[in-house]
UniProtKB/Swiss-Prot annotation:
Protein name per Swiss-Prot or TrEMBL: Transaldolase
Functional note: Transaldolase is important for the balance of metabolites in the pentose-phosphate pathway.
Record-level GO cellular component terms: cytoplasm
Catalytic activity: D-sedoheptulose 7-phosphate + D-glyceraldehyde 3-phosphate = D-erythrose 4-phosphate + beta-D-fructose 6-phosphate
Subunit and interaction comment: Homodimer.
Residue numbers annotated as active site: 126
Record EC number: 2.2.1.2
Pathway info: Carbohydrate degradation; pentose phosphate pathway; D-glyceraldehyde 3-phosphate and beta-D-fructose 6-phosphate from D-ribose 5-phosphate and D-xylulose 5-phosphate (non-oxidative stage): step 2/3
Domain of life: Bacteria
Keywords: Cytoplasm, Pentose shunt, Schiff base, Transferase
Localization per Swiss-Prot or TrEMBL: Cytoplasm
Amino acid sequence: MPSQLEALRRHTVVVADTGDFEAMRALRPTDATTNPSLILKAVQQEAYRPLLVQTARAHQGASPAEITDRLLVAFGRQILDIVPGRVSTEVDARLSFDTRATVERARGLIALYQAAGVPRERVLIKIASTWEGIQAARVLQAEGIRCNLTLLFCLPQAAACADAGVQLISPFVGRIYDWHKKNAGAEWVEDARRGANDPGVQSVSRIYRYYKRFGIETEIMGASFRNVDQILALAGCDLLTISPELLTRLAQTEGEVPAALSPQAGHDDADAVRLDGGEVAFRTQLNEDAMASEKLSEGIRLFVADARKLDALIESHGAA
């Protein structure tokens, strides 16, 4: 009998959500995703500290922002030596509400990759799914720079991304689950909210059906998982990005994994209506969704905090 990881691969592209090279070698994902928190975690480990030191010292006098981008690309290059597919590299979250600055920073990241001999087709630029971020992605996609819109918590965000023609979206599962569990308090019944009944799973499934219903080509990559049940309930999603801990658990557990999602599911939603992708509708609908608006803001704040910590590490190694 196959492992659950092997069985999952029959339905879904498996992506590693980590900056840990050794974990990638062991688990053999197709793609990999990184974010400021994962890179910060990696460079605090002895195995990866030399990459920070070498990058910082090689560019003494450059700004922390420039060193950070060079460090992200250094990680990305090594990741692409391990995975056969793509790596996602994130634009500084402090630019989440600045379309022009996001575009410029993304162009710079792609230029660094291309200077290192990495074709742009192997890189996804991660951008927060704010209105400004989505408009930046629209510009970048038109230039052939492929984007991964992250911190996505609701269908209106996904619809706006589709209208912008982005390559891929990363709707979050675990953070939606966290919000609903916290807000339910004593009324939360864990067993009743597992698998297909998990609010995070339901959100991604809704987005998946919407995309398939309207023939939207943007890829959907479920992200932010808290447990294996959430992963298995989304088998069949285009891609799933999973932590090494949960990938290992899947690899160590035998069992078949049936597809929970299929393209046909979207055609069953015959009454679905295509959402208005305009700015007013986007901001109104996001504001009315307490969970999505709160988790988007919180996610940006967390990434900004880790970006500042990374700046401090860079400065401590003489880069500023």
